[in-house]
């Protein structure tokens, strides 16, 4: 749905683990990266499924492989990266979005390693936007670094996830406040900036751009 926070236009998708089939995708059955929403939509269509909603879901290398941890249908494709490093991904604390059998949650990376939750799907990104109801300590209110951004937050009961794309440029501080203040998400994770893209059948929207790595998708069976 379309929404707004202060002067920032937003697109927000709220999903429920009770009613929505939420998944992560990276490669086709032939082992090639999907790279875009159309390729994923076509493969789903070939399997009597349809793509309801999707967005880029985690940072990736030039070959479209994930920078951090990635798990698909219980299979670990990339191990957890816990060391600090360059760029937004390495701005600790970073985190992992995890899809369980009947729950959804954003974990701080070391918390994830400590608890070892049983995730059907998982994707690591960074930085954390909100951690235990607090904004990331390195975010600056007056920062001039503004980009189109997207991310995910989860509800306290782990039944809902909020996927948000800012349609206007925004700094980290304000983007994190959207999850904390507007959506009341105790934990939220940044996905990306410049390449942020979204697919929504309901909104008749299919953003085009450079090839992407991990893709978050809400999938439905064909009627």
Q: What are these regions, as identified by a protein language model?
A:
Residues 51-53, 95-96, 104-105, 127-128, ...:
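Structural motif
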Residues 65-139:
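Active-site-adjacent helix-turn-beta-strand microarchitecture at beta-sheet edges
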Residues 16-19, 98-103, 131-133, 154-159, ...:
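Short acidic-glycine loop/turn motifs at beta-strand connectors
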Residues 27-32, 111-115, 165-169:
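Short, solvent-exposed aromatic-acidic interface loops
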């Amino acid at each position: 749905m379309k929404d707004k926070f202060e002067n920032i236009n937003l697109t927000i998708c709220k999903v429920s683990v009770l009613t929505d089939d939420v998944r992560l995708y990276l490669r086709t059955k032939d082992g090639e990266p999907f790279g875009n929403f159309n390729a994923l939509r076509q493969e789903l269509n070939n399997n009597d499924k349809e793509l309801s909603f999707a967005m880029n879901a985690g940072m990736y290398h030039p070959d479209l492989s994930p920078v951090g941890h990635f798990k698909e249908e219980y299979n670990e494709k990339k191990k957890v990266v816990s060391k600090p490093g360059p760029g937004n991904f390495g701005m600790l604390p970073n985190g992992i979005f995890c899809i369980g059998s009947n729950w959804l949650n954003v974990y701080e990376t070391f918390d994830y390693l400590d608890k070892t939750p049983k995730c059907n799907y998982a994707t690591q990104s960074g930085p954390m936007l909100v951690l235990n109801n607090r904004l990331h300590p390195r975010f600056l209110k007056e920062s001039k670094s503004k980009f189109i951004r997207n991310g995910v937050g989860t509800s306290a009961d782990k039944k809902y996830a909020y996927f948000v794309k800012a349609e206007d440029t925004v700094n980290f501080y304000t983007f994190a406040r959207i999850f904390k203040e507007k959506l009341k998400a105790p934990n939220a994770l940044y996905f990306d900036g410049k390449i942020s893209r979204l697919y929504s059948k309901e909104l008749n929207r299919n953003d085009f751009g450079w090839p992407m790595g991990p893709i978050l998708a809400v999938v439905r069976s064909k009627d």
